Amino acid sequence: MEEFDSEDFSTSDEDEDYVPSGGEYSEDDVNELVKEDEVDGEEQAEKTKGKRRKAQSIPARKRKQSGLLLDEEEDGEEDSGGSSREEDEEEQEGGLGSETSRKKKEDELWASFLNDVGTKSKAASSSQVKVAEETEETSSSKPLVKADELEKPKESEKVKITKVFDFAGEEVRVTKEVDATSKEAKSFLKQTEKEKPQALVTSAATPPPAGSGIKRTSGMSSLLGKIGAKKQKMSTLEKSKLDWESFKEEEGIGEELAIHNRGKEGYIERKAFLERVDHRQFEIERDLRLSKMKP
């Protein structure tokens, strides 16, 4: 066993050229293998060199082709630019021509329209002028009438009215200052107009010294005078109110009493307020009743 081990360790250098197939190669075979390896390496190197040359030649060709393409594109752009400019010029000329033709057509249409409507417009304008003049005249006359109507009440804003009342067989004269447009002033003017012809009749029927017919006329005139001179009667309340008003005017305490009555403690103001409340309540109840009565 020891000898066998020593032999195995001594042959360790020969293991480098050991082939597992079991056959031994000669030196010629080894040289051929080496040559084949060298040939394979050279072929691979040539292949890589060829690839590099091809790669270098391809961009050059591409550059040449791109240069040609760029030149062709520039030429095409120049040609297209020239053609587009010519087209733009033609379009501009055509647009100007169309605009001028449109303007001419519009002018012709307008002239024909004016010729058709010329006479009618003149007649309409003359009628409008006449209407405007009439309206101006009426408007100028209306303010004058209104001014006259307004000036009349300004001249006689207040009118004094004297009324005669009969209180216990005594004549009581009451004078008031009332607006000219009030109902009292109008009624007073009507009464005075009615009394004027009666006074003329009584003055014309003066009794001469003798005659039966004359007595009759005097009797008739006295009757008319009595009828015309019939006086209104005055109640005690109206007489007391009249006396109170005259007293306030004589003493000059009307404003003081009005200020006092407007205060919180004024009896008249409270009474007026309560009357307004009652009237309002009555109106509300009336509206409710009417709404219920409607179908």
UniProtKB/Swiss-Prot annotation:
Biased composition (Low complexity): 120-130
Crosslink site: Glycyl lysine isopeptide (Lys-Gly) (interchain with G-Cter in SUMO2): K146
Modified sites of kind N6-methyllysine: K215
GO cellular component, one term: Swr1 complex
Positions of region (Hydrophilic): 174-213
GO biological processes: cell adhesion; chromatin remodeling; fibroblast apoptotic process; negative regulation of fibroblast apoptotic process; regulation of cell population proliferation; regulation of cell shape
Stretches for region Disordered: 1-155, 188-219
Bias-annotated ranges (Basic and acidic residues): 145-155, 188-197
One Pfam family it belongs to: BCNT
PROSITE patterns found in the cross-reference section: BCNT_C
Protein's UniProt keywords contain DNA-binding: no
Subcellular location: Chromosome, Centromere, Kinetochore
Domain BCNT-C: 214-295
Cysteines paired by S-S bonds: none
Protein purpose: May play a role during embryogenesis.
Name listed for the protein in its UniProt record: Craniofacial development protein 1
Organism of provenance: Rattus norvegicus
Gene: Cfdp1
